[in-house]
UniProtKB/Swiss-Prot annotation:
Listed name of the protein: Glycoprotein NB
Organism lineage: Viruses, Riboviria, Orthornavirae, Negarnaviricota, Polyploviricotina
Transmembrane annotation, as ranges: 19-40
Keyword Glycoprotein in annotation: yes
Gene name as annotated: NB
GO annotations of cellular component type: host cell membrane; membrane; virion membrane
Broad class of the protein's primary localization: virion
Length: 100
C-alpha cells in the first residue's frame, strides 16, 4: 500500500529551473512595464493636466496633477473616486444623485 508516495528522482532539474526562470522573467517584465507606465503617466499628466477625452468631464489644472483634484465648479471638496464615461452607463447619473 505504498502507491500514494511520489518518486521525484525522474524530475529533470534543468526543465524545472527553466520554467521557474521563465515565470520570474514574465513577472519581472510585467512589474517593470507597470512602473514605467505609471512614471510615464505622471510626466504626461504634468504636461497636460486636463483630460480632454470625449465623453468625460474636463478637469481643472492642478498643481502637480495630484490624483484628488477638485471639480471645475466645486472647489470645496477634493475629488474622490473614478470617472465613469457616459457611454458605459447611459442611464445612470452618479454625480447628481442624493440619498432619500
Amino acid at each position: 500500500m505504498n502507491n500514494a508516495t511520489f518518486n521525484y528522482t525522474n524530475v529533470n532539474p534543468i526543465s524545472h529551473i527553466r520554467g521557474s526562470a521563465i515565470i520570474t522573467i514574465c513577472v519581472s517584465f510585467t512589474v517593470i512595464l507597470t512602473v514605467f507606465g505609471y512614471i510615464a503617466k505622471i510626466f504626461i499628466n504634468k504636461k497636460n493636466c486636463t483630460n480632454n477625452v470625449i465623453g468625460l468631464r474636463e478637469r481643472i489644472k492642478c498643481s502637480g496633477c495630484e490624483p484628488f483634484c477638485n471639480k471645475r465648479d466645486d472647489i470645496s471638496s477634493p475629488r474622490a473616486g473614478v470617472d465613469i464615461p457616459s457611454f458605459i452607463l447611459p442611464g445612470l447619473n452618479l454625480s447628481e444623485s442624493t440619498p432619500n
